[in-house]
Regions:
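A structured binding-face within diverse protein domains that lines the active/interaction site
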Residues: 1-161
Length: 161
């Protein structure tokens, strides 16, 4: 069960990591839509926030895993994690994060892959976890915003609907 604040999961170990192996084996895959995601660029030795969107303006779809578990007082909590892939050699994402850190990027899906991601057997779904082509991403500076408050389990839970 995913019981910890595990926002991102390394795709390379998702089938064996204690927090993810059961949801992965059960095929509890999901697609997390978003308008954009943000990454820190340290090329100037200072944190410069970058905003990433799809170049065509369509929503971004991130490969994820979901899980239901019991919290305090038998409260049922639905949660998800975003899958990431290595990006050490990605033309754009290799510039993100601090020097010396492994470069990671979200595992983005194309619309034509949505059904495959949700329906393929777990062993076959790995094929879809790869670097997203840099020419399909738009990368721009993003203004600094006030820091977020710490995340609570309620903020990380799925919304019934």
């Amino acid at each position: 069960m995913i019981k910890f604040n595990t926002v991102n999961a390394r795709s390379e170990t998702v089938a064996s990591a204690a927090s993810y192996k059961a949801p992965w084996a059960r095929g509890q895959r999901c697609i997390v839509p978003m308008e954009a995601f943000f990454e820190p660029n340290w090329e100037t030795e200072k944190h410069v926030r970058r905003k990433f969107t799809r170049r065509d303006g369509e929503p971004i779809a991130v490969a994820g895993l979901w899980e239901c578990w019991r919290g305090c007082g038998d409260q049922v909590i639905e949660s998800y994690t975003l899958l990431t892939v290595n990006a050490d050699d990605h033309p754009v994402m290799r510039r993100m994060h601090k020097p010396g850190q492994e470069k990671r990027m979200l595992a983005l899906l194309d619309p034509a892959e949505y059904d495959q991601w949700l329906e393929r057997p777990p062993a076959d779904a790995f094929e879809l976890l790869r670097q997203y082509p840099s020419e399909l991403l738009l990368d721009e500076p993003a203004p600094k915003v006030a820091p977020e408050a710490p995340r609570s389990p309620e903020q990380l839970s799925l919304v019934d609907g």
